[in-house]
Amino acid sequence: MQEQKNILVAIANPGDNTTLGFTTIRFSENRIVEGTALSHEEGSDENWINDSGIYEISYKLFGQKEGAGSFNFNAVLLVNDQTIEDTFNEGPVLEDVVNNRLTLTSTVILRLEEGDVLKLQGVSIEDILYNRARIDIEKIA
C-alpha cells in the first residue's frame, strides 16, 4: 500500500501583494493540495502545519522596483511569526539599473510541529513590489 503524499503548492499572482518592501506574502491560488498534513486558505499568508514532521519547503519570490537606482531585496521563512534566521536568502545589490527585477529561490528542510504557521516574508527597505511567488511544501518524514 502506497503512503499518502502530503503536498501543498500555493501561488501568488499579480495583485495579491500590494504592500511594498517588508511584508509577508499572500497566496491567492492553491495549485495542489494533497493529504491532510498541510492547509492554506486562498488569499492568506498563512500555511498551516496539521501534522508534526520534517518538511521540505521550496519557494520562488519575484521582486520588482519602479525606476532606475539601487535595488535589493531578501526573503526569509517565518514559523509562528518568528524569523528562522538560517533561511534568510539575500539578493544581490544592483546599482543604477533600469530593469529592476529579480527572483529569489530557495529550498530548505525544517522540522515543524502540529499547529505551526509557516509564512514567506519579503524583506527590503526599498519600495519592492512582490508581483509573483510560489511556495511548495511537502512532508517528507
Where do the language-model regions lie?
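Extracellular jelly-roll beta-sandwich "head" domains, especially the C-terminal globular C1q domain
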Residues: 1-141
